[in-house]
């Protein structure tokens, strides 16, 4: 373990994984409870397009990515709320279009870009600046959640009830999707755009198999996410060997998927046993 801490990139990776493991489940709980889990996938693809635009223009890539992701995510939410098209159709259009835009622009770019690192992340790609960005976003998410927890909870449970109580639902919807977009952008270097949505959804799905309490679900999800993220990052370091470097995101998602499968099977077996005992 001390060997890992002797490398700056590993220290950054461990800190980043801790911050992401706390932040992602908080936002993920509100995403899952509103039954818009696929929004995470779409937002990650929008981030991919944003990165490609920034690289292609060679003009403050990070700020360009943030700006594009925020604008595109707000447009996505607006179209989903307008009922002009089915929400699934809107997500599908943004999902495929953003991936296409990103692929074309990166191909046309004069810069040498490792697409695999953008898609899946890399331990070697994480910088101290990335950690600072993650910490800023993480603290913002925690503070906002603490001060607006009650309203966010009611909105997640019942939109109509929230409107009756004169809660500005649109504001909190916009806030959720903007924070999620920014979190995805600042976490791309570590986990990549393809698997970041799994960190939003899987820990929550695991926690929901263990408790029905909203607040407890968040805390359990954070615990599970911390366990899998730290294990995934550490395993990535020990399993990788030049020139083969295993992205930590893949290992993290495999661990989360395995735990989800286990708790799901265990719960189903309990239900089956109860049904059998009643006959």
Annotated model-derived regions:
Residues 16-24, 46, 50, 54, ...:
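Alpha-helical transmembrane segments in multi-pass membrane proteins
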């Amino acid at each position: 373990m001390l060997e890992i801490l002797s490398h700056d990139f590993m220290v950054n990776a461990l800190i980043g994984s801790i911050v992401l493991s706390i932040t992602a489940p908080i936002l993920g709980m509100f995403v899952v409870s509103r039954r818009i889990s696929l929004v995470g996938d779409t937002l990650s693809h929008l981030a991919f397009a944003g990165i490609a635009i920034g690289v292609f223009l060679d003009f403050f890539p990070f700020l360009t990515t943030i700006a594009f992701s925020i604008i595109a995510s707000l447009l996505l939410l607006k179209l989903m709320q307008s009922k002009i098209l089915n929400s699934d159709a809107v997500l599908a259009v943004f999902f495929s279009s953003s991936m296409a835009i990103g692929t074309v622009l990166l191909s046309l770019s004069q810069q040498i870009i490792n697409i695999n690192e953008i898609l899946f992340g890399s331990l070697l790609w994480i910088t101290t600046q990335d950690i600072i960005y993650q910490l800023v976003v993480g603290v913002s998410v925690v503070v906002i959640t603490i001060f607006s927890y009650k309203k966010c909870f009611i909105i997640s449970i019942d939109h109509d009830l929230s409107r009756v109580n004169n809660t500005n639902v649109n504001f909190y919807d916009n806030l959720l999707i903007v924070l999620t977009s920014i979190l995805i952008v600042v976490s791309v270097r570590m986990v990549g755009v393809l698997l970041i949505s799994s960190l939003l959804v899987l820990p929550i799905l695991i926690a929901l198999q263990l408790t029905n309490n909203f607040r407890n679900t968040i805390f359990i999800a954070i615990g599970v996410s911390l366990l899998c993220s730290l294990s995934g990052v550490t395993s990535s370091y020990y399993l990788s060997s030049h020139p083969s470097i295993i992205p930590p995101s893949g290992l993290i998602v495999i661990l989360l998927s395995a735990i989800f499968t286990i708790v799901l099977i265990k719960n189903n077996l309990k239900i089956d046993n109860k049904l059998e005992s009643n006959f």
